[in-house]
């Protein structure tokens, strides 16, 4: 029994070390975009900041695709239509800046603007009409009743989403319903990047 426990602990330790290495590698890849993000932000009148944009890049692609901010769908309505990281960041920053301005105008929290990057800008009005504060419960309802049906999921079909923040809340997402945990993941990744930048 002790040998089995020791083996399990060794395996767990190796897994944690490996995951730490992978996360560190991904963070360094995202940080390589920092000068590009700084330049783009300097050219825009925006409330967005470098750390937030980098956390969004980490959340979207971990810096591993040309369309680092997954800007294609909001730009052209088609996936992978942007094949240049500079164009992706420019469009992503423009959309985020627009969302932040709309959120301020509507009197809602800035994390609503971040969640709207995933759900679409109409989410800002929805939150304004439902208390002014983005929550997982409101995001879940919006995903189920607005986003998913608009993209063909009228039956409320779900799938399991393997992310620690999702697992805490049950781990399900609605098919074609966006990511209800998006703003929470970005928030978490802000701290993750900050932590991994120390090493």
UniProtKB/Swiss-Prot annotation:
A Pfam family recorded for this sequence: Lysozyme_like
Question: Which terms in the GO cellular component ontology are assigned?
Answer: cell surface
Organism superkingdom: Bacteria
Do you know which SUPFAM superfamilies this protein is assigned to? Lysozyme-like
Location in or out of the cell: Cell surface
InterPro entries, alphabetized: CwlT-like_lysozyme, Lysozyme-like_dom_sf
Name under which the protein is recorded: Pneumococcal vaccine antigen A homolog
Q: Which organism is it from?
A: Streptococcus pyogenes serotype M1
Q: Which gene encodes it?
A: pvaA
């Amino acid at each position: 029994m002790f040998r089995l426990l020791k083996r399990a602990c060794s395996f767990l330790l190796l897994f944690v070390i490996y995951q730490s290495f992978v996360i560190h590698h991904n963070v360094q890849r995202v940080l390589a975009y920092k000068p590009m993000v700084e330049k783009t932000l300097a050219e825009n009148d925006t409330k967005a900041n470098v750390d937030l944009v980098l956390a969004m890049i980490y959340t979207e692609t971990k810096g591993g695709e040309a369309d680092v901010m997954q800007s294609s769908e909001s730009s052209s309505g088609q996936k992978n239509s942007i094949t240049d990281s500079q164009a992706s960041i420019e469009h992503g920053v423009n959309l985020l800046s627009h969302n932040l301005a709309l959120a301020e105008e509507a009197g809602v929290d800035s994390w609503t603007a971040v969640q709207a990057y995933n759900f679409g800008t109409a989410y800002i009005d929805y939150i304004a009409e439902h208390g002014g504060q983005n929550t997982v419960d409101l995001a879940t309802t919006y995903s189920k009743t607005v986003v998913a049906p608009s993209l063909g999921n009228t039956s409320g079909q779900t799938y399991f989403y393997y992310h620690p923040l999702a697992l805490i809340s049950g781990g399900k997402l609605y098919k074609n319903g966006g990511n209800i945990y998006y703003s929470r993941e970005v928030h978490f990744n802000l701290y993750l990047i900050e932590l991994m930048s120390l090493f």
